[in-house]
UniProtKB/Swiss-Prot annotation:
Name of the protein in its database record: Large ribosomal subunit protein uL1
GO biological process, one term: translation
Summary of the function given for this chain in its UniProt record: Binds directly to 23S rRNA. The L1 stalk is quite mobile in the ribosome, and is involved in E site tRNA release. Protein L1 is also a translational repressor protein, it controls the translation of the L11 operon by binding to its mRNA.
Gene Ontology cellular component list: large ribosomal subunit
Length: 235
């Protein structure tokens, strides 16, 4: 077993072996995020699904009200006048078959790939390089679209694509340590609602297995999912 660093061991002593109310958990995470940079805050959620079955797969998007605090590089594969539209909308990389060839050679300097439907037959050939990295465009994720400008705008503003991995776990960033705990909770609540709304039809038994939050360099804290689900804003 990998030995904990002195810093991680010290931070871990501040966390009790129990499930925390969400705002208390976020306060602890923020307090422990004392690295020399603005740490990313992440959620790791184990769901009661088996993604090897198509009716138990989860892949969708969510627009976080306070964004993620991170800038992302977006590549767009399209054709004709849409190439200039992608450029004007703020895409970091854009092109037609030239970009397809570049990606096929291993040039993957982007965080998100958007494609127009007419280019998907060519993009499909990139499955072996895009698939393992979770970058293959998908209509459900809003990354296969003719409305390139709006898609770029939304993803740049903090819209996230997320999915459950092979073990049924969702890993998603939802803010920065510099965010207030209230802003982090708003984002976390929005994420929870999206996961519930998009519950796979084949899910059986208990849907939410465990719910942890953590920072880039800190230990994780288990969150009371019921308290997140049942929260109602005052007024």
């Amino acid at each position: 077993m990998k030995k904990l660093s002195k810093r991680m061991a010290a931070l871990s002593t501040k966390i009790e072996d129990r499930i925390y109310p969400p705002l208390e958990a976020l306060s602890i995470i923020k307090e422990n995020a004392n690295a020399k940079f603005d740490e990313t805050i992440e959620a790791h959620i184990r769901l009661g699904i088996d993604p090897k079955y198509t009716d138990q797969q989860l892949r969708t998007t969510v627009a976080l009200p306070h964004g993620t605090g991170q800038s992302i590089k977006i590549a767009v594969i399209t054709s004709g006048e849409n190439v200039s539209k992608a450029k004007s909308a703020g895409a970091d990389l854009f092109g037609e078959e030239d970009l397809v060839e570049s990606i096929n050679k291993g040039n993957m300097d982007f965080d998100l790939l958007i494609a127009t439907p007419d280019m998907m037959p060519k993009v499909a050939k990139l499955g072996r390089v895009l698939g393992p990295r979770g970058l293959m465009p998908n209509p459900k994720a809003g990354t296969v679209t003719n409305d390139i400008a709006n898609a770029i705008k939304e993803f740049k503003a903090g819209k996230l694509e997320f999915r459950a991995d092979k073990a049924g776990i969702v890993h998603v960033r939802f803010g920065k340590a510099s965010f207030t705990k209230e802003a982090l909770f708003d984002n976390l609540k929005t994420l929870q609602e999206s996961i519930d709304k998009n519950k796979p039809s084949g899910s059986k038994g208990k849907y939410w297995k465990s719910f942890y939050v953590t920072s880039t360099m800190g230990p994780s804290v288990q969150v009371d999912i019921s308290a997140v689900q049942d929260y109602q804003p005052e007024g």
